[in-house]
């Protein structure tokens, strides 16, 4: 989706920079995504795939070469928390560079590398046991998250029939808020479903 947005914005402006998709899983998803599209959506997707500026980085050696390149470009790489994957190598170069911008899409777990980069009060970060001074710009596009919004979670989980719902993903504060609101919605629908917040000692019998 982000790739399509970049294409739609830049295609008519003689955009001079390459857009690299540096994620093996992401490339596989591109291929699968094309199988489910049809009509105008498929036509637009094919336009994006055939865009001269778009380059897929499939192997590790090509990714390493991109890291060491000084070419101005856009790099799309997965790992929302930045804790694993190729993105870490790109960050080692981008973070101390005042001319670089790191753009996040969606939620990042508190304490993760991504969350630290989003925090304007953090002056340096550690990647693979080496400190990097934060000189790059960083922004977050919360509107592009692939996660369901709070209201949709309430609607869905309060509509299903089950004995219990276990909340696992997310920060403790967010899970506590969801538990309280969801319990209230379930009670309004005369349901006795238990809402449980998972922790490391919780054991569930299936």
Positions of predicted regions on the chain:
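Acidic/His-rich, metal-assisted hydrolase cores and their charged scaffolds
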Residues: 1-206
């Amino acid at each position: 989706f982000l790739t399509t947005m970049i294409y739609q914005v830049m295609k008519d402006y003689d955009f001079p920079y390459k857009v690299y998709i540096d994620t093996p899983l992401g490339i596989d998803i591109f291929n699968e995504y094309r199988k489910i599209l049809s009509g105008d959506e498929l036509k637009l997707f094919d336009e994006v795939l055939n865009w001269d500026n778009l380059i897929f980085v499939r192997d590790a050696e090509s990714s390493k070469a991109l890291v060491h390149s000084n070419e101005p470009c856009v790099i799309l790489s997965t790992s929302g928390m930045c804790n694993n994957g190729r993105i870490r190598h790109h960050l080692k170069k981008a973070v101390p560079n005042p001319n670089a911008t790191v753009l996040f899409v969606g939620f990042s777990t508190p304490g993760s590398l991504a969350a630290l980069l989003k925090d304007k009060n953090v002056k340096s970060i550690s990647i693979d046991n080496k400190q990097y001074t934060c000189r790059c710009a960083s922004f977050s596009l919360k509107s592009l998250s692939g996660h369901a919004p709070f209201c949709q979670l309430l609607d869905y989980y309060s509509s299903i029939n089950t004995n219990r719902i276990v909340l696992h993903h997310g920060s403790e504060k967010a899970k506590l808020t969801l538990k309280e609101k969801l319990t209230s919605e379930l009670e309004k629908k005369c349901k006795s479903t238990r809402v449980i917040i998972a922790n490391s000692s919780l054991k569930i019998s299936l």
